[in-house]
Amino acid sequence: MKLRPLHDRVVIRRSEEESKTAGGIVLPGSAAEKPNRGEVVAVGTGRILDNGEVRALAVKVGDKVVFGPYSGSNTVKVDGEDLLVMAENEILAVIEG
C-alpha cells in the first residue's frame, strides 16, 4: 500500500536511533526517547494560500529532517511499518550533507 498525503502534509519514516548511551548503557525500549529525525517518504501537493494559489513544499522525498518531540502525532501503519504524517510546518530543519 502506498500513502499519498494531501495538501501540506508530509509522510516521514522515523530514523532508527542507538539504544545505547554515550557511556555504553543499553536502554530498554520503554526508556529510550523516540528519535526526532527521519526521512521524507512522500509529500503532498502543497499549501493552499488565502488567494487560492498552491505553494509547493520546501521538503522533497529523500530529505533527512528534524522535527519536534511532539510533532507527527498521527502515526499510520503501512506494510508493517509505522510512518508519521505531519504538516510541513512541524518540520524544524532539513539535514544537509
UniProtKB/Swiss-Prot annotation:
Highest taxon listed in the record's lineage: Bacteria
Entry annotated with the keyword Nuclease: no
InterPro entries linked: Chaperonin_GroES, Chaperonin_GroES_sf, Chaprnonin_Cpn10_CS, GroES-like_sf
One cellular component (GO) term of this entry: cytoplasm
Single GO MF annotation: ATP binding
A Pfam cross-reference name: Cpn10
UniProt keywords, alphabetically: Chaperone, Cytoplasm
Main location: cytoplasm
Location in the cell: Cytoplasm
One GO process term, biological-process aspect: chaperone cofactor-dependent protein refolding
Protein family per UniProt: Belongs to the GroES chaperonin family.
Assembly information from the UniProt record: Heptamer of 7 subunits arranged in a ring. Interacts with the chaperonin GroEL.
PANTHER family to which the protein is assigned, alphabetical: 10 KDA HEAT SHOCK PROTEIN, CO-CHAPERONIN GROES
Function: Together with the chaperonin GroEL, plays an essential role in assisting protein folding. The GroEL-GroES system forms a nano-cage that allows encapsulation of the non-native substrate proteins and provides a physical environment optimized to promote and accelerate protein folding. GroES binds to the apical surface of the GroEL ring, thereby capping the opening of the GroEL channel.
Cross-referenced HAMAP family: CH10 (MF_00580)
Name the UniProt record assigns to this protein: Co-chaperonin GroES
